[in-house]
């Protein structure tokens, strides 16, 4: 079995544009073709000038394989090219430097409700209750992740986690790693450091939240319990922070026309998400 080494830079485009790195193998047939990731490439074809042949006893003077079956070893170079983030935010001049998104996850305009999520889940669904909740074994006292109280965990389970991991964060998963669901502290800061004005924007009721001459609009997007969406112009916005005294609760922002509070709510319920990021100044 003959061998020849070659270098290929492979560009993959996904949510992030990446170059991957690995040592992998492909088979070259008797006609001098190599199959790489199911793509047949001629030996004398230089792909973006990144394919290189090394002179060895298995390669002729021109740098090409002459005959026989060979095993080809090639490398894929690793690099990260971040895709441009198109999600808009507002700098309200908050002490923490937190930047708030202009619309909810799943929305296309500030007045749209967007998607509803159970806490720690990253896709919307039809029914929001304990039987469909990802992080329990069918009941509120059988948590399987994010549990600090043994009587609320499945068979006494605890893991000490009080904030969502990025892979369970609806903002990070649906937008990018630059975004997070807000912490309880970030919600408290928004609630106490800004002016909240109940208003109607493009026919949708909600709060205009203002500071430093700038503002965001939070629609009263309601919330799901089971398959029922609440009514009454209410707002339920998840934080990424677990409840303090009940591991089956998580902290959230709750409001109606005359009150804005930070409370805790059953994790299985469906609430909206307004993402945050931290200023890079």
Positions of the model-derived regions?
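C-terminal, surface-exposed recognition/capping segments
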Residues: 84-281
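Cellulosome-associated attachment modules in secreted, modular CAZymes
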Residues: 5-84
């Amino acid at each position: 079995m003959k061998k020849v080494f070659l270098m290929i830079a492979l560009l993959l485009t996904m949510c992030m544009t990446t170059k991957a790195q690995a040592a992998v193998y492909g088979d070259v047939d008797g006609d001098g073709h190599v199959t790489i990731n199911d793509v047949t490439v001629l030996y004398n074809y230089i792909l973006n000038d990144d394919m290189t042949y090394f002179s060895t006893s298995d390669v002729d003077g021109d740098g090409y394989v002459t005959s026989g079956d060979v095993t080809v070893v090639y490398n894929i170079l690793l690099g990260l090219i971040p895709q441009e983030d198109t999600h808009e935010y507002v700098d309200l001049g908050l002490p923490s430097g937190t930047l708030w998104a202009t619309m909810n996850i799943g929305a296309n305009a500030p007045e749209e409700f967007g998607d509803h999520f159970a806490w720690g889940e990253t896709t919307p669904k039809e029914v929001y209750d304990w039987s469909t909740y990802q992080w329990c074994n069918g009941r509120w006292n059988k948590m399987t992740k994010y549990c600090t109280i043994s009587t609320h965990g499945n068979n006494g389970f605890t893991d000490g986690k009080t904030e969502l991991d990025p892979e369970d964060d609806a903002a990070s998963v649906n937008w990018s790693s630059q975004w997070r669901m807000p912490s309880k502290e970030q919600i408290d800061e928004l609630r106490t450091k800004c002016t909240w004005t109940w208003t109607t924007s493009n026919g949708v009721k909600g709060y205009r939240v203002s500071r430093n001459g700038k503002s965001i609009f939070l629609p009263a997007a309601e919330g799901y319990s089971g398959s029922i969406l609440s009514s009454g112009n209410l707002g339920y916005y998840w934080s990424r922070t677990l409840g303090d005294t009940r591991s089956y609760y998580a902290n959230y922002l709750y409001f109606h026309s005359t009150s804005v509070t930070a409370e805790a709510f059953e994790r299985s319920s469906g609430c909206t998400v307004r993402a945050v990021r931290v200023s890079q100044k």
